Amino acid sequence: MNGHKGHLTRRAWLIRVIKGLAGLGAFMIFPRLNPVQATETIPAPERRESIGETFANESMVFTAGFFIFPHAGDAEISLVPLYEKGRYQATISGKTRGIIGFLTRHREDTHISELVENEKKDRFICIRLIRDTKIGNDHTIKIFEMDYQNRKMTVRRIKGKRESVHVKPIPPGVIYDDPLTAFYNFRFGTYGPVRYGKSYKIDTIPGKKVKHIFLHVASKKETEEKKKNLSIAKKVNYLVYLRIAPEIIKSKKGEIEGWFTPSLIPLYGVAKDVIFFGDVKGKLVHLERG
């Protein structure tokens, strides 16, 4: 069976299974977290002297779902200080749950970014990125190590007993921000003040066809129009469109829409056209700060 035919067969099979289970939706039992209610006040991070001190020990938990499966998985984003001052580890980890976990062989994804602050302490720079994927008994690790002094990036891919290593040049003056690094830099104002209608083009680790992360903050008019039917309408202030490498979120175009509070806490988002599942919706259910 060739790859294309296999892809279609798996998709058709998954659609049939989901349709067959539609009548059981009311009886599905998934583990739940206490949600951050729309009526609650979402505290802003206390802006401190440096970007690291501002977000250190912040943890966000999201629940994600689609169609009749409102809780198909969980994801957590966290930032912790490391052994050396000015060095941090940012992590995003996600796991499918329940029947979707069974159908996806309990897929687990973990992205770890080792970050250092720049001299002004107003920007994170990723010096090592680890992408770890487990699907059933399959385990793949991809490691990117950035050496900005010598302008080179070492890429290691480990799958089972097989390992490959490639060294690629980093163009002069370029700093690669992976999506996790960009998440904190954007919220801190590293790319400039967040304004309605503003767009950002951010250099990122080159993917198959992507060399940049694109961010766009919707206009005030568009934001007000689109949030009319949101239960969290009074808590969100910005609608942000994000485009990253499609292979990272396994979608057609790598497009994400996110709703942020005035202090840039993400409350709700949609990953568009995820393969097999369509639009996957996520909401913040737990927030902690150190």
Identify the function of each model-found stretch.
Residues 39-148, 192-290:
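Acidic, serine/threonine-rich low-complexity disordered tracts
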Residues 34, 156, 165, 242, ...:
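Residue-level marker of intrinsically disordered, low-complexity segments enriched
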Residues 140-199:
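A charged, solvent-exposed segment within the mature domains of Sec-exported extracytoplasmic proteins
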